[in-house]
């Protein structure tokens, strides 16, 4: 049975296994110690929300929600900043369950909106998001890495 829960500090080791897989998939490789320290800080400060999916006592996926502040709307929103399901667990409704719980979390926090982005080639993700009512926004996003 699938279980969705908010991540806690005692989930850190299992999360690191998933984060390592996720970062490899994205071809982003910060040191795992840096990822661990950053994640531990997020969990301790509770400034973001990580929801985990576990199946048969094994963590198989997560969704990471971060706050977004809109002066135009004078409300807070949330961004699905990261969503990952282990490859051998895909196609079983786990991402759908994670998004469903992310929507519940957004409503519980009285968020004005829930935003996300997906790679252009990830058609399965596009279809999934649209099935929830997400609409494609043609806004142009730019990215600049400002780290040294």
Model-derived features: positions:
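Conserved active-site alpha-helix within GNAT-family acetyltransferase domains
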Residues: 96, 120-138, 144
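Conserved GNAT acetyl-CoA-binding A-motif
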Residues: 107-117
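Acetyl-CoA-dependent GNAT
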Residues: 6-13, 17-75, 81, 100, ...
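Conserved acetyl-CoA-binding loop-helix of GNAT-fold acetyltransferases
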Residues: 85, 91-104, 127, 131
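Extreme N-terminal starter segment of soluble prokaryotic enzymes
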Residues: 2-3
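Residue-level recognition of the GNAT/N-acetyltransferase active site
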Residues: 68, 81, 86, 90, ...
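N-terminal beta-strand motif that seeds the catalytic metal site of vicinal oxygen chelate
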Residues: 118, 147-148
């Amino acid at each position: 049975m699938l279980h969705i829960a908010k991540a806690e500090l005692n989930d850190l080791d299992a999360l690191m296994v998933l984060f390592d897989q996720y970062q490899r998939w994205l071809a982003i490789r910060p040191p795992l110690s840096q990822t661990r320290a950053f994640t531990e800080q997020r969990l301790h400060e509770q400034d973001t929300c990580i929801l985990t999916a576990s199946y048969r006592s094994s963590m198989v996926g997560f969704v990471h929600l971060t706050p977004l502040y809109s002066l135009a709307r004078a409300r807070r929103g949330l961004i699905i900043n990261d969503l990952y399901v282990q490859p051998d667990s895909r196609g079983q409704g786990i991402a759908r369950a994670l998004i469903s719980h992310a929507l519940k979390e957004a409503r519980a926090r009285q968020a004005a909106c829930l935003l996300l982005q997906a790679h252009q080639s990830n058609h399965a993700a596009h279809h999934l998001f649209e099935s929830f009512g997400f609409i494609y926004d043609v806004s142009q996003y730019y990215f600049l890495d400002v780290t040294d």
